[in-house]
Curated annotation (Swiss-Prot):
Keyword check for Cytoplasm: yes
Protein's name in the database: Cbp/p300-interacting transactivator 4
Location of the region described as Disordered in the Swiss-Prot/TrEMBL record: 23-122
Species: Rattus norvegicus (Rat)
Pfam family, one: CITED
Residues annotated as transmembrane: none
Compartments in which it is found: Nucleus; Cytoplasm
Keyword field contains Protease: no
Purpose of the protein: Acts as a transcriptional coactivator for TFAP2/AP-2. Enhances estrogen-dependent transactivation mediated by estrogen receptors. May function as an inhibitor of transactivation by HIF1A by disrupting HIF1A interaction with CREBBP. May be involved in regulation of gene expression during development and differentiation of blood cells, endothelial cells and mammary epithelial cells.
Signal sequence bounds: none
A Gene Ontology cellular-component term: cytoplasm
Amino acid sequence: MADHLMLAEGYCLLQVPHAPRTLQPYPGPGLDSGLRPRGAPLGPPPPSGTLAYGSFGSPVSFQPFPVSQPPGAGNAHLQSAATPSPGRMPAPPSAAGGPSPLQPAPGAASPLPLPPPPPLPPALGCMDAELIDEEALTSLELELGLHRVRELPELFLGQSEFDCFSDLGSVPAAGSVSC
């Protein structure tokens, strides 16, 4: 089924003799694989009038979609999507060439007053409005054992918590290396 995908690179199904390919060394920044300068057109220059449209011809001869549709064909979804959302006023028909209805004209007053922005959450480092009771803090400190923090030795980076087995308070197993 996928045998055609597992062919060796450069293998052609058509049994046509081909010239051996040679790889060109990288020529530098201004060239594409040494074949042509970048931006240079391939082949002879096209006749005038076909520069922008290539082999499709002029835009009059190539139209990918029909210009007119029968009434009611495929526009029900577009009509529902084109209805203005609540809170937005549709643009008057005279404003077709004017500013976008989503952006107010400079110097014009907004038709609907804007609600005030929601309050920002308190930033880190700000004091809360509620003060915490000092007794609650000390009881929490005692409960968690944080009052002993000043008694513990400082641990520096690169040091292990226990330098020797004697720090553990138990006898090491027989045959182990001690400090």
